Every structure is written in C-alpha cells, then in structure tokens.
C-alpha cells in the first residue's frame, strides 16, 4: 500500500508542478489527483470533491494533501477534509514534490515530514 497524494491549488499550479516534477524525476511513483480551485468555484462544492478524491486515493496508507498558500481557499478546503488518515502540508513548490517522489515507500507521517523538508530546502536567497 502506498500513500495517495492530492494536490489542491489555485488554478493550474498543481498541474504544472506535477508535470514538471514528473518530467524531472522521469516518472510519477504515486497515485495522484489534482484539484484546481478557481475564483468562481463554490468552496463547499470543492470540499465535497476533495473528500471524494481522498476516499478514492486512500488504499489504506492514507493521503498526503499538498496545497499552495496557507490561509487561502485551497488550503482552507484541504485542512477541512474529513478523513482519518490525512496529512496536509501547505507551501507547495517543486522541491517539495520532488522530495516526496524520492520516498514512495514511506508512511504518511514520514512523507509529510519529507514534504516539509523539501519545501524548505527549495527556498533560498541567492
């Protein structure tokens, strides 16, 4: 059993990050679903869809939900998903996804830590 991944982002941010990460990594080692939130979407409708995706993705190991900006509609929806085995990490960036991709056999808790580590490592003043 592998952890499922749900990307909940503004517009196509998640789609583009996933495409780029898959291209760099060479493959996508997880079962992933994308949920794009646009300004015309109704939050309750999106939350209902997010919960359906989580149920679909959870093979027993749980679901890691990655979202872009904390405190915005996508992250608020992600943090309100009602499911027992879920971890939500905000601040999505390419480094975060790539770091998660490196650990497909890790547990949900371990992957949430890897997501945080990857996200932080991808931010630097140069």
Listing of model-derived features with the role each one plays in the protein:
Residues 2-64, 69-126:
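N-terminal loops that bind phosphate or other acidic moieties
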